[in-house]
UniProtKB/Swiss-Prot annotation:
GO biological process: response to xenobiotic stimulus; tRNA 5'-leader removal; tRNA processing
Natural source organism: Homo sapiens (Human)
Single GO MF annotation: ribonuclease P activity
Annotated region (Disordered), positions in chain: 117-154
Compositionally skewed regions (Basic and acidic residues) per UniProt: 137-146
Matches recorded under Pfam families: Rpr2 (PF04032)
Principal localisation: nucleus
Keywords annotated in UniProt: Acetylation, Metal-binding, Nucleus, RNA-binding, tRNA processing, Zinc
Name the record gives this protein: Ribonuclease P protein subunit p21
Subunit structure as annotated in this protein's UniProt entry: RNase P consists of a catalytic RNA moiety and about 10 protein subunits; POP1, POP4, POP5, POP7, RPP14, RPP21, RPP25, RPP30, RPP38 and RPP40. Within the RNase P complex, POP1, POP7 and RPP25 form the 'finger' subcomplex, POP5, RPP14, RPP40 and homodimeric RPP30 form the 'palm' subcomplex, and RPP21, POP4 and RPP38 form the 'wrist' subcomplex. All subunits of the RNase P complex interact with the catalytic RNA.
Free-text function comment from the UniProt entry: Component of ribonuclease P, a ribonucleoprotein complex that generates mature tRNA molecules by cleaving their 5'-ends.
Transmembrane segments: none
The UniProt record lists the keyword Ribonucleoprotein: no
Amino acid sequence: MAGPVKDREAFQRLNFLYQAAHCVLAQDPENQALARFYCYTERTIAKRLVLRRDPSVKRTLCRGCSSLLVPGLTCTQRQRRCRGQRWTVQTCLTCQRSQRFLNDPGHLLWGDRPEAQLGSQADSKPLQPLPNTAHSISDRLPEEKMQTQGSSNQ
């Protein structure tokens, strides 16, 4: 289990604003302006406090107008094929900005990979310091000093 989270209150506030935007759209789909305001506020708080948001949250917010992207309500989702790869294209219905996401079932986001987790990093063995190969003259043994001085006199 991870230790105490820095800026816990800020993350709770971001979570509340994100959930409030979802609730507003679920209750009244016509009230997109209030949901957009909640998402914009969440985005500005995260920027001001330099907090990293989860990629799944970032994918559901429009980067242009800060609208909550709900397929069929505030955005359209299309499956496209380009150069043999399949892409999901989300287009915001408010500002017409589109985002493309690669459809790769084997793709894992960095945060979902095992090496990104703090617990697995703590379990790995600690790094050993490298031996210092560059010795100064003062680090040499007295016999070595005598040998070098004797060879220089010859």
